[in-house]
Amino acid sequence: MSIGIALATIAGGFLFPFAIRMMWGKMVDEWGAIGGWMAAAFIVGTVWTINHGIPKSMIYQSGTVWVDMAVAAGIGVFTASLLTGGKFSKSVVNLAAAVVGGVLGGFLLSLFL
């Protein structure tokens, strides 16, 4: 993997949590619940397309194992929350649920992929 591909992959991983932190809450504040649905469609869809869905995508897949964009979003938003004064102890239950859900989802995908 070249330096350019590595930097593009890092930037692609940064892009998703950054877009979530910058836009999702504002869309919900402006348009209510429908803003959350619109954010889910526009932010996730656009960033997925940039990272994976075009021929020269930002994220380089080097093998058969893949990491979902949710990992980047979770780590990025979690870190940003801690840096802005969030408490780690309040997030333990959510982190545990996310890990269990990720393992379960990965297992289910492994059954047919």
Swiss-Prot record:
Signal peptide: none annotated. It is found in: Membrane. The chain crosses the membrane at residues 3-23, 30-50, 63-83, 92-112. Keywords: Glycerol metabolism, Membrane, Transmembrane, Transmembrane helix, Transport. Induction: Repressed by GolR. It holds the Pfam family DUF6905. The keyword Metal-binding does not apply. It is a multi-pass membrane protein. One of its GO terms (biological process) is glycerol metabolic process. Its main location: membrane. GO terms for cellular component: membrane. InterPro entries: DUF6905. Could be involved in the glycerol uptake either via facilitated diffusion or active transport. This is Putative glycerol transporter Lin0367. It comes from Listeria innocua serovar 6a (strain ATCC BAA-680 / CLIP 11262).
